[in-house]
């Protein structure tokens, strides 16, 4: 298998909102906030659902890789409930090998409320549910060892058990790629993420804000120097400034495609990683 992903198995619930909904609910635009089930339901109670689809950061990337013709797999925990069944069906429909056997869990399948504002930005409120209970016993070691690359998400560090799954996957992987996931996620786990990037990852994906925060700088030239010294591949998205890939002394920059109508930025970074 080319690539296996391990991440939070989340069902995305997409709703359109005005900017004042974000501020009124003390949310920070364009970021992800962890919420409990009651807060999730409270937020959703005043909204109209536009779409419900299988999601999760790494899962989105894995689906993208499948659509590009790669043989891929995914490990993520869902409950044996209606949403969990739909999640598995969604992955299989996209030709993703799903290496997890559902069973009845105490918590429901994880859900993410994705709030789309008029400028097409997305703000996420995630109730991890069963997804946040993934542990080392859920990692299919054979599937990991038989994959060229294991792709992980920084969000796995937000709970205790998933960290063990993360570490087991790294131990058994041929090559490891990781997305830093979110600016606040980087801030929560900065020392751990910096150690991972320097010592354990082969490929790192980040946006400009995340990588600046990780190395404690406001100067992007310092990011370039860091990338050169790192000696491993680091790929950074920079919004309107395009993207850049750094590997030792080799730097490749890509401009954005202009005059596109942006409808929804949900999963944009995930598909870029694919």
Which sequence ranges carry the predicted segments?
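Glycine-rich phosphate/adenosyl-contacting loop at the front of the ribokinase-like
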Residues: 1-75, 85, 262
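Conserved phosphate-binding/catalytic region of the ribokinase-like
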Residues: 3-9, 23-29, 46, 191, ...
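Cofactor-binding loop segments of dinucleotide-utilizing enzymes, especially the Rossmann-like FAD-
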Residues: 6-8, 77-80, 103, 116-118, ...
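Hydrophobic beta-strand scaffold residues
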Residues: 72, 98, 176-177, 234
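A glycine-rich helix N-cap at a beta->alpha junction
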Residues: 90-107
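Conserved phosphate-binding/catalytic loop of the ribokinase/pfkB sugar-kinase fold
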Residues: 99-104, 114-160
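Short beta-strand scaffold segments in enzyme catalytic cores
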Residues: 111-115, 123, 242-246
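Conserved beta-alpha-beta core of the PfkB/ribokinase-like small-molecule kinase fold
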Residues: 149-224, 232, 241-243
């Amino acid at each position: 298998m080319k690539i296996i992903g391990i991440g939070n198995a989340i069902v995305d619930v997409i709703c359109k909102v005005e900017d004042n909904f974000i501020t009124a609910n003390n949310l920070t635009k364009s970021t992800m906030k962890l919420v409990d089930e009651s807060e999730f339901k409270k937020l959703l109670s005043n909204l109209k659902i536009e779409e419900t689809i299988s999601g999760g950061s790494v899962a989105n990337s894995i689906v993208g890789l499948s659509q590009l013709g790669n043989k891929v797999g995914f490990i993520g925990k869902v409950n044996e409930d209606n949403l969990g069944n739909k999640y598995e069906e969604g992955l299989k429909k996209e030709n993703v090998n799903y290496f997890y056997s559902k069973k009845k869990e105490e918590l429901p399948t994880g859900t993410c409320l994705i709030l789309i504002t008029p400028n097409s930005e997305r703000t996420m409120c995630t109730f991890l549910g069963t997804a946040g209970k993934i542990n080392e016993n859920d990692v299919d070691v054979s599937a990991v060892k038989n994959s060229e690359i294991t792709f992980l998400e920084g969000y796995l560090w937000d709970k205790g058990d998933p960290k063990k799954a993360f570490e087991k996957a790294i131990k058994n992987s041929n090559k490891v790629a990781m997305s830093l996931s979110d600016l606040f996620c980087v801030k929560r786990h900065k020392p751990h993420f910096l150690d991972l990037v320097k010592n354990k990852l082969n490929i790192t994906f980040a946006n400009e804000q995340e990588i600046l925060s990780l190395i404690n700088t406001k100067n992007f030239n310092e990011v370039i120097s860091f990338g050169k010294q790192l000696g491993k591949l680091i790929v950074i998205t920079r919004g309107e400034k395009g993207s850049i890939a750094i590997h030792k002394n080799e730097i490749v920059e890509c401009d954005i495609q202009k005059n596109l109508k942006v409808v929804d930025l949900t999963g944009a970074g995930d598909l870029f990683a694919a």
